[in-house]
A protein has these predicted regions:
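Histidine-centered copper-binding motifs that mark active-site loops
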Residues: 1-175
Length: 176
């Protein structure tokens, strides 16, 4: 896949898929249908504004901050010393237990081939056909866990390189 390295163009959608066919013209992977599934994260907020907010306050988009109620729940469950030690540990790391990502779904939506979840991108096929799905993570900061409910998937390539086929229920695709 390709993407821009200028300013915040990638975060504004300057990316796309590139599929390079084998030089021999003979693809060792046989499929009745072949789809590129390009996954990405998207915000309507200008990426430079997002970056500015994160530079001023790294947890700006993290609304699930630890509360006094949770602290007292920890005290009753684990004791005062353990509850305070837990808070100190997170403070020393300068993060909190809910800090999974810099930006949350509050600000992001997720796209499949440029379509929002409401658009419901669909790849057509007939029962019994072998369908090749070329998943690409074009997200700026999102890891995607991919599964097709009720179906197994066979991984045959990673980063464009053929691999020993392995059957899985789910794959995780990291940020490039």
């Amino acid at each position: 896949w390709y993407h821009s390295h200028s300013g915040m163009q990638e975060q504004r959608g300057m990316y796309g898929a590139i599929v390079i066919e084998p030089a021999s013209g003979r693809d060792p992977i046989r499929a009745d249908r072949d789809y590129v599934v390009q996954l990405s994260d998207w915000t309507d907020e200008h990426p430079m504004r997002v970056l500015t907010k994160l530079k001023m306050q790294s947890d700006y988009y993290n609304f699930n901050q630890p509360t006094a109620v949770e602290f007292f729940r920890d005290v009753s469950k684990d004791g005062v010393s353990a509850a305070l030690a837990k808070r100190r540990m997170w403070n020393q790391m300068r993060m909190n237990p809910t800090d999974l990502a810099d930006i949350s779904a509050y600000s992001y939506t997720y796209l499949m081939n440029g379509v929002t979840p409401a658009g419901n991108w669909t790849g057509l096929f007939r029962p019994g056909e072998k369908v090749r799905l070329r998943f690409i993570n074009s997200g700026a900061m999102t890891f995607f866990d991919v599964r097709i409910p009720g179906l197994k998937m066979t991984v045959v390539q990673a980063d464009g390189q053929n691999v020993e086929p392995v059957t899985v229920d789910e794959i995780r695709i990291g940020v490039a």
